[in-house]
Amino acid sequence: MSLINGLLALLGEIESDAIAVHEERCISVRNRNADCLRCVEACTSGALAYRAGELLVEPERCIGCGTCATACPTCAIELRNPTDAELTAQLKHSIVATKGHPVIVCEQALEAANVAADDASAACAVPCLGRMDESALVGLAAYRAFDATLACGSCETCPHAPGGALVREVVEGARNLLEAFGSSMPIDLEECVPERVLEPGGSHGQAGSDGVGRRDFFRSAKDASTRAAGAAVAEELGMVEAEPVPAAHRKVGADGTLSQFVPTRRVRLYNYLQHVGQPTADEVETRVIGAVSIDAQKCSSCRMCAVFCPTGAIKKLDEGGVFGIVHRPSACMQCRLCEHICPEQ
């Protein structure tokens, strides 16, 4: 089975109640010369694997940790349980419950501390910290948290070790983004559950001081601001977030490019940064925003980069007698598809 056929089969098999798959966003599906397997490399449970040149998928092993979705630069994989909006509601609850000092804790850390999730109801509990992406952490600053703590187990010996490696990269990127926008909010990664989120005697899911049970709160909480803010930032980027396109109906646009989209996480990230402050730096080192460097002497103007770019960060330019491309770093996800498919390298 070819890599592309393997990817299509893989994406189809992992779709579940926990995970939504938008195969038209996958850069390896968009162009067979791409070599991205970030979701496979990040999988913490062995549900996705690449061995002996073959892609393997075992859906029953998926724990719904979301690390594959965090690793995917184009949001080809999205979490359904919880969704990003539901996770945001949990984070906002932790901000309120801890009086501005939210805690995100993984299941391994809770197990190591012999603490049930309901006995740490002030924290946001996730299967693995690899679930957290930069927009979620930057959002804590936008919601006026004083600091943020991510509590993990021993990631080196954890069966979900890839998630521990990824969250460290995410934390570093989030710190850099906040610093670039004038925020000094600390983001700490600790191998213990902070005492401030533990309930004396254990509540075992009983209602808190606000009279709302933790699970009922998470089930009913909505994040309406995300939709309004998302529309505003998407309009500023000159694009509207695309609805998933069924493979059978996927078409090339009038200008010869594949369908393009702005993932909700990118829109949410920019909205949060606008609330955090104004840029204080010209450059920032992070895995989620990039800038393409083009050697004009080598470029043959084939514009394949614009044809396959998933977000429109590189677009065709045909106006005023000018023939070429235009690059918008604000939409670049660092998927590196343009780099891999450029015939001139």
Predicted segments, located by residue:
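N-terminal secretory signal peptides
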Residues: 164-212
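Structural alpha-beta junctions
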Residues: 118-127, 142-147, 172-186
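Iron-sulfur cluster-binding cysteine motifs and their immediate structural context
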Residues: 32-58, 67-85, 304-321, 337-345
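Short, flexible/disordered intra-domain loops and linkers
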Residues: 156-165
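Extended interfacial segments that mediate partner engagement and assembly in macromolecular machines
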Residues: 75, 83, 87, 92-139
